[in-house]
UniProtKB/Swiss-Prot annotation:
Binding site for Zn(2+) 1: C147, C150, C200, C203
Entry protein name: Chaperone protein DnaJ
Function statement: Participates actively in the response to hyperosmotic and heat shock by preventing the aggregation of stress-denatured proteins and by disaggregating proteins, also in an autonomous, DnaK-independent fashion. Unfolded proteins bind initially to DnaJ; upon interaction with the DnaJ-bound protein, DnaK hydrolyzes its bound ATP, resulting in the formation of a stable complex. GrpE releases ADP from DnaK; ATP binding to DnaK triggers the release of the substrate protein, thus completing the reaction cycle.
Highest taxon of the lineage: Bacteria
Organism encoding this protein: Pseudomonas putida (strain ATCC 47054 / DSM 6125 / CFBP 8728 / NCIMB 11950 / KT2440)
UniProt cross-references to Gene3D superfamilies, sorted A to Z: DnaJ domain (1.10.287.110), Heat shock protein DnaJ, cysteine-rich domain (2.10.230.10), Urease metallochaperone UreE, N-terminal domain (2.60.260.20)
InterPro entries named among the record's database cross-references: DnaJ, DnaJ_C, DnaJ_domain, DnaJ_domain_CS, HSP40/DnaJ_pept-bd, HSP_DnaJ_Cys-rich_dom, HSP_DnaJ_Cys-rich_dom_sf, J_dom_sf
Subcellular locations according to the entry: Cytoplasm
First and last residues of every CXXCXGXG motif repeat: 147-154, 164-171, 186-193, 200-207
Length: 375
């Protein structure tokens, strides 16, 4: 008996997205699951067929092979890659199916019981000086907090949750699966044993409400982009008495107009005049601690790098401060007066023919001569 097209099996178009495939498979798995159709051979076969189709189409490489070669591209008996349960991870989708089928008691425990609140993430932008020296900032974070009128219970003030009639208050029900009897989380109360018949009007029975929370964050010295500060218990409130989540403040350091940072070292470019580069001199350069004097030796070329030790960043995790590395950029003079041009022309004439004043140029021209001499 020939196999049906996998797209036909799932009831989707050939251009279906991953979400479309998952939705279609989930629907079929719910419909034909053997536990819902005990003793029905046809349903069992369709369930297996849907599994096989989803296993292939949810895998990018297998789907490409199927699109190009059909079943021959994925059937091991025809030399293909094979289709079954060996190469796919169905834990996420089976979790969804079992959650709906058994009311939250599928793999991993489902939705019932006290649950910890979600962790939150907040991106905090700092300038370089704040990141290097440390600071304290105030932030405003949207979150979910326990509803005050009902104290997080979800029930209207003055009322109390009722015993769940489905499970009798124990939060678990027994489901018959073929020859086995399995205990599952109650689908009505989600394991609480109680149901809310008169919900709180403030939170509509959710037990939590949205609120902005203002917090003070102490940022240690030396942080860098990507570092995280954990504020324990400042995330979303838990449900059904569960603990509160945490807040993670993620550092993002803005670009600086002068300095670039690489770990504990700082870098900057220092423009110097043509004459200072030739004759040498002294100039002031900025650091995060103020200005310092930098001595420029005569004959300094563009790209020369000077290291100011200890003028970088002290890492947040300890250790000595890094260095500040200043890269020199020699500026060619512009907007010259007549007299200045005359002086430069005199200098050029005096240097002409003497390669000792231009060591790099001398080496470069020697290389050019050798290059053309080899041609």
């Amino acid at each position: 008996m020939s196999k049906r097209d996998y797209y036909e099996v799932l009831g989707v178009e050939r251009g279906a997205t991953e979400a479309d495939l998952k939705k279609a498979y989930r629907r079929l798995a719910m419909k034909y699951h053997p536990d819902r159709n005990p003793g029905d051979k046809e349903s069992e076969d369709k369930f297996k067929e849907a599994n096989e189709a989803y296993e292939v189409l949810s895998d990018a490489s297998k789907r490409a092979a199927f699109d190009q070669y059909g079943h021959a591209g994925v059937d091991p008996s025809m030399g293909g890659g094979g289709a079954g349960f060996g190469g796919a991870n169905f834990s996420d989708i089976f979790g969804d199916v079992f959650s709906d089928f058994f009311g939250g008691g599928g793999r991993g425990g489902g939705r019932g019981g006290a649950q910890r609140g979600s962790d939150l993430r907040y991106t905090l932008e700092l300038n370089l000086e704040e990141a290097v020296r440390g600071t304290t900032v105030s932030i405003r974070v949207p979150t979910l907090v326990n509803c005050q009128p009902c104290d997080g219970s979800g029930a209207k003030k003055g009322s109390t949750p009722s015993t769940c009639p489905t499970c009798g208050g124990i939060g678990q029900v027994r489901m018959q699966q073929g020859f086995f009897s399995v205990q599952q989380t109650c689908p009505r109360c989600h394991g609480q044993g109680k149901i809310i018949t008169d919900p709180c009007t403030s939170c509509h029975g959710e037990g939590r409400v949205e609120e902005y929370k203002t917090l003070s964050v102490k940022v240690p010295a030396g942080v860098d982009t990507g570092d995280r500060i954990r504020l324990s218990g400042e995330g979303e409130a838990g449900t059904h008495g569960g603990p509160t989540g945490d807040l993670y403040v993620v550092i993002s350091v803005r670009e600086h107009e002068i300095f670039q940072r690489d770990g504990k070292h700082l870098y900057c470019e220092v423009p110097i005049s043509y004459t200072d580069a030739a004759l040498g001199g002294e100039l002031e350069v900025p650091t995060l601690d103020g200005r310092v004097k930098l001595k420029i030796p005569e004959g300094t070329q563009t790209g020369k790098q000077f290291r100011l030790r200890g003028k970088g960043v002290a890492p947040v995790r300890g250790g000595g401060a890094g260095d500040l590395l200043c890269r020199v950029a020699v500026e060619t003079p512009v907007n010259l007066s007549r007299r200045q041009r005359e002086l430069l022309e005199e200098l050029r004439d005096s240097l002409e023919g003497d390669s000792s004043h231009s060591p790099k140029a001398s080496g470069w021209f020697d290389g050019v001569k050798r290059f053309f001499g080899d041609l």
